[in-house]
């Protein structure tokens, strides 16, 4: 249970200026009483009130029995005793109320303060729960962001070799097109080769000359 200093710090403005009783600071049972315990404590604090009540009941019972027996004198004595017991009970109640007025006022303040502390504890628990949920949401968002970044890095790393290979293939195809001539183009004729062919045509066949279309040699004198 928090001490009186903490209680005063969280008390409302009307209660913070008043010192709280130190006899209840460390008494946890005072704050956790049920109805029977509360009545028992009140009886221990003001024992004259239950004594006066018991005396009143006893006097009334004695008067009833004397009336049944027909003893009128005893009936009168019991009624006077009942009145005296009731007066004693009233005096005990007034005296007890006056004697315990300050403590009861402090008890009311303590009960109000306890209710405020319970409400504040609930509010703090609610705030802490919201903070924990917010932290969990942020951690989840960070994990998802890291996963997205790693996936993007893996995709970029896997796509880089494919791009280089495509560029290499395109360069190789361009070079191949430049080296090879296109279909239907005639390669340039070598002039030395044409001169040799003309000389061979002028030589006779027995000297290695070429034959004509009809198989005859081309002899030119």
Swiss-Prot record:
Where does the UniProt entry say this protein principally localizes?
mitochondrion
List compositional bias (Low complexity) regions by residue number.
9-23, 157-173
Q: Which domain of life is it from?
A: Eukaryota
Coiled-coil segments: 112-151
Identify the Pfam families for this entry: HIG_1_N
For the keyword Iron, the answer is no
Instruction: List every stretch annotated Disordered.
Output: 1-29, 144-221
Mind telling me which residue stretches traverse the membrane in this protein?
Answer: 46-68, 83-102
Topology of this chain in the membrane:
Multi-pass membrane protein
GO biological process terms on file: mitochondrial respirasome assembly
Is the keyword Coiled coil assigned to this protein? yes
Q: How does it assemble?
A: Associates with the respiratory chain complex III/complex IV supercomplex.
Functionally, this protein is described as follows: Cytochrome c oxidase subunit which plays a role in assembly of respiratory supercomplexes.
What family name appears in the similarity comment?
A: Belongs to the RCF1 family.
Q: What is this protein called?
A: Respiratory supercomplex factor 1, mitochondrial
**Organism per entry:** Neurospora crassa (strain ATCC 24698 / 74-OR23-1A / CBS 708.71 / DSM 1257 / FGSC 987)
């Amino acid at each position: 249970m928090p001490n009186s200093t903490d209680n005063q710090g969280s008390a409302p403005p009307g209660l913070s200026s008043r010192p709280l009783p130190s006899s209840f600071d460390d008494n946890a049972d005072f704050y956790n009483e049920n109805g029977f315990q509360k009545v028992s404590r009140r009886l221990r604090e003001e024992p004259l009130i239950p004594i006066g009540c018991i005396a009143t009941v006893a006097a009334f019972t004695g008067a009833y029995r004397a009336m049944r027996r027909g003893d009128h004198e005893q009936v009168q004595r019991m009624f006077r005793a009942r009145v005296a017991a009731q007066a004693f009970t009233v005096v005990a109640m007034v005296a007890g109320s006056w004697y315990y007025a300050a403590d009861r006022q402090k008890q009311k303040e303590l009960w109000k303060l306890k209710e405020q502390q319970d409400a504040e504890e609930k509010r703090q628990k609610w705030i802490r729960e919201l903070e924990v949920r917010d932290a969990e949401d942020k951690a989840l968002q960070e994990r998802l962001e890291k996963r997205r970044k790693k996936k993007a890095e893996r995709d970029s790393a896997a796509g880089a070799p494919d791009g280089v290979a495509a560029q290499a293939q395109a360069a190789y195809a361009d070079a191949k097109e430049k080296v090879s001539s296109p279909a239907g183009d005639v390669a340039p004729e070598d002039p030395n080769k044409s001169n040799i062919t003309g000389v061979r045509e002028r030589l006779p066949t027995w000297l290695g000359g070429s034959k004509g279309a009809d198989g005859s040699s081309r002899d030119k004198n």
